[in-house]
């Protein structure tokens, strides 16, 4: 699974393939990030994983 943190201006802030790493990142940065999107692989569509 690929996770991508998006800022409010739609720029990418952080990317990872680790669910634990993204959970930890959200806990620390939840006030400054806009959305986290995820997808299973390069050919799969994106889905919202977390949203402010």
Task: Identify the function of each model-found stretch.
Residues 9-15, 27-52:
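Short, mixed-charge low-complexity intrinsically disordered segments
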Residues 22:
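Short amphipathic alpha-helices within nucleic acid-binding modules
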């Amino acid at each position: 699974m690929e996770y991508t943190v998006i800022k409010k201006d739609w720029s990418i802030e952080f990317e990872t393939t680790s669910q634990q790493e993204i959970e930890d990142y959200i806990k620390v940065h939840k006030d400054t990030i806009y959305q986290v999107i995820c997808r299973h692989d390069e050919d799969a569509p994106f889905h919202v994983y977390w949203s402010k």
